[in-house]
Amino acid sequence: MGKVIGIDLGTTNSCVAVMEGKEPKVIENAEGERTTPSIIAFANGEKLVGQSAKRQAVTNPRNTIYAVKRLIGRNFIDPMVRKDQGIVPYNIVKADNGDAWVEADNNKYSPSQISAFILQKMKETAENYLGDKVTQAVITVPAYFNDAQRQATKDAGKIAGLEVLRIINEPTAAALAYGFEKSASKTIAVYDLGGGTFDVSILEIADGVFEVKSTNGDTFLGGEDFDTRILNHLIDVFKKENGIDLSKDPLALQRLKEAAEKAKKELSSAVTTDINLPYITADSSGPKHLNIKFTRAELEKLVDDLIEKTIEPCRKALQDAGFKASDIQEVVLVGGMTRMPKVQEAVKKFFGREPHKGVNPDEVVALGAAIQGGVLNKEVTDILLLDVTPLSLGIETLGGVFTRLIDRNTTIPTKKSQIFSTADDNQHAVTIRVFQGEREMAKDNKLLGQFNLEGIPLAPRGLPQIEVTFDIDANGIVHVSAKDKASGKEQKVTIQASGGLSDAEIEQMVKDAEQNADEDKKRKELIEAKNAADSLVYSTEKTLTEYGDKLSSDDKGAVEAALAALKAVLESEDTALIKEKTESLTAASMKIGEAMYKAQSESQPAAESATNDEKIVDADFQDVEKK
């Protein structure tokens, strides 16, 4: 079994780690950074990932996709999706299956596809470091992700060419990294406020056993919402001062978003910051500039309710685990937003203790995923992880009631069966509708999917016995079966959301990804060939100017001809031709090298002679006769 990498697929940034010996290690990307922006852009037929996509976002807002994790596994009519539609500059569109997809460069992409591009970047980062192919990964998700979101994340891994050995909850991964090689027994809370989601998990750690007691959260609450509050504040202030609404200008919106994120980060360490955006827009009177002094107090006032929204899930998680706040011995902070002083203050106030700041909130989740990868491939042998399902699972029964089979915070993997019957006389088929959530009526919960059990022998209602079995695997993914006890007829399914990607769609996306990988590789080769050729043209022209007169007319003519031939193909898209002409010029320009060497050799003796002459000192002397 090869190396298993751990990937924190984040809303704002992503991170990859691997076990190196007995320690997990974060791997730096090609730019030398330990995290990679979770941003994809399409520009001039080229796909950009990470920092390169982020750099051009201001000039290409419509085709720059960020925070797609907030859309993954969601339906287009989801209120949370509608909320994001009014904020992001790119288009969120309805897919044929009803899911929320994104549109860029005149193409539609599923959130799983966009996530796959980020995962491919993480995979390449690991392969470059390890010098070997990587095919297996542990990928993290918010603890409060439902089945559809987990399935969609697993699909993203498959599209990226990865076998996803395990989907692991982010707070659990953080706890693994925190408690790794620590012997003390502790009850801890992991407070994870990231770029797009919030989770809190209560765990007991003892002798290498990490047992999740409960989890809670909000999959649509994170740093992006804090940025939006600042962005809207800037729009309001500018409108008040200039009478211009910037919310309809995609270019201005992208600049405002970047300024909001920057100001938010600065105010974690400073109490005031200046937001300066020259030439943000223009009207008949000329260009307009945005210049605002923004304070930490103003920021805290803008986002106070968002911070408060994280406290109720903490209260519920403690209640479900059967603990009081005073029972928690350590509170581990995870996610970039926990750097905000007001967030730390709220956590301290609720739990009654200073939160632990000894882990890097941007990296700890990836480190934990790498440790879990080590457990799965037997590199790490003294750890047992017991996670839970975040939401109750059940089916719709008579009257639209939600009947639970598995309660939230049940340790996984788990299996549970229950006997149901028919609602009508002589009913020969039943439809099993599977839901996930905490509401009493099925329609108020998340429909995960449905299937039919047919061929039930005709009988009065209430007589047939239909055994419904729920099986949740270690990834938190649901498998359901229904069996008629009389006939033995059985129907089994891995729940696929009412939307979601079909196997055929995933297969096509895998092929597209492989094709794109080949195209990306060819594009990279072309760019590298052009760069090498351009560099050679420059150096040849320079040396030809300096030493051209030392060449014979034949040699000089050969170099000039090869130089002209290379310059003529520089703008072409033919990598092989550019390489061929580069090699020809390299061979021809060897004559310049010989001329340079000869010229230097000839000047060397003369220089040495002059140096020696300088060392001779004329002196007066006289003979002294011996006495």
Curated annotation (Swiss-Prot):
Residues 599-610 have a biased composition (Low complexity). The keyword Glycoprotein does not apply. Residues 597-627 are annotated as: Disordered. The modification Phosphothreonine is found at residue 197. Induction: By stress conditions e.g. heat shock. SUPFAM superfamilies: Actin-like ATPase domain (SSF53067), Heat shock protein 70kD (HSP70), C-terminal subdomain (SSF100934), Heat shock protein 70kD (HSP70), peptide-binding domain (SSF100920). InterPro entries: ATPase_NBD, Chaperone_DnaK, Heat_shock_70_CS, HSP70_C_sf, HSP70_peptide-bd_sf, Hsp_70_fam. Residues 612-627 have a biased composition (Basic and acidic residues). GO terms for molecular function: ATP binding; ATP-dependent protein folding chaperone; unfolded protein binding. Keywords: ATP-binding, Chaperone, Nucleotide-binding, Phosphoprotein, Stress response. The keyword Chaperone applies. NCBIfam families: PRK00290.1, PRK05183.1, prok_dnaK. HAMAP family: DnaK. Acts as a chaperone. Belongs to the heat shock protein 70 family. This is Chaperone protein DnaK. The lineage of its organism: Bacteria, Pseudomonadati, Pseudomonadota, Alphaproteobacteria, Rickettsiales. The gene is dnaK.
